[in-house]
């Protein structure tokens, strides 16, 4: 059985349970690691968890039961985002990719206007970074010092996304290489300032160098999601 999502009523029957979840758990990778009861009640009563732009669901796991909540954000935009919160006692069990895969399917199946689904996390949230990759999402941006940290220096905010066409076809549209301004007249694209562009492939004493090709993306993604590689990234 798959992970399912139950619509949540923050202003009614589910208010107390939502406030309890927010205040009884630590959220070390969110902007506010600890949420006080007055803060939670103010946000819930102010519509932060259910309005035109937000919709919230309980996360129902077939083995563990209700494990947390997920809030869809920017629903009036063709690229919504999400806020995933799993209760502390269910973390570290590898549930993230299951949840995100099921959530992606729900969004694309029930929201025909959505063309891409996006999420962001801070650079030190290794479990969430792994979750994105294992769910087949593609890294699109790395915003340096873009994530405010309560009482500390800002960290980078890392953005991942899933395209509807990739979800539907089971393929991956890679992010293109950096594209700068066209090279000056008389110099080939890719050439160093003081010389000509190398002739690819470029043999060396021990190996042959060549640019990445589009068909390299699959094995590169697999390599960079291996635990022994991820911990050094």
Predicted regions mapped to residue ranges:
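Acyl-donor (CoA/ACP) binding surface of acyl/acetyltransferases
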Residues: 1-25, 56-232
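Conserved GNAT-fold acetyl-CoA-binding loop/helix
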Residues: 26-46, 228-233
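Short loop/turn motifs at secondary-structure junctions and domain boundaries
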Residues: 47-52
């Amino acid at each position: 059985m798959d992970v399912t999502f139950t619509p949540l009523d923050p202003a009614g029957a589910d208010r107390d349970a939502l406030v309890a979840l927010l205040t009884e758990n630590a959220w070390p990778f969110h902007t506010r690691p600890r949420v006080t009861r007055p803060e939670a009640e103010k946000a819930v009563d102010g519509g932060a968890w259910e309005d035109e732009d937000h919709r919230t669901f309980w996360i129902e796991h077939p083995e563990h039961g209700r494990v947390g909540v997920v809030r869809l954000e920017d629903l009036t935009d063709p690229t919504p985002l999400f806020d995933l919160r799993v209760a502390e006692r269910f973390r570290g069990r590898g549930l993230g990719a299951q949840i995100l895969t099921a959530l992606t399917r729900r969004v694309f199946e029930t929201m025909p206007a959505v063309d891409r689904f996006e999420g962001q996390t801070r650079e030190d949230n290794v479990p969430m970074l792994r979750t994105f990759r294992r769910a087949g999402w593609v890294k699109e941006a790395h915003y340096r010092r873009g994530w405010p940290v309560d009482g500390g220096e800002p960290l980078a905010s890392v953005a991942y996304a899933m395209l509807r066409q990739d979800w539907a076809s089971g393929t991956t549209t890679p992010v293109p290489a950096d594209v700068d301004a066209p090279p000056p007249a008389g110099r080939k694209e890719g050439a160093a300032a003081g010389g000509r562009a190398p002739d690819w492939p470029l043999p060396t004493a021990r190996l042959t160098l060549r640019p990445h090709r589009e068909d390299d993306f699959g094995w590169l993604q697999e390599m960079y999601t291996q635990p022994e590689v991820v911990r050094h990234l």
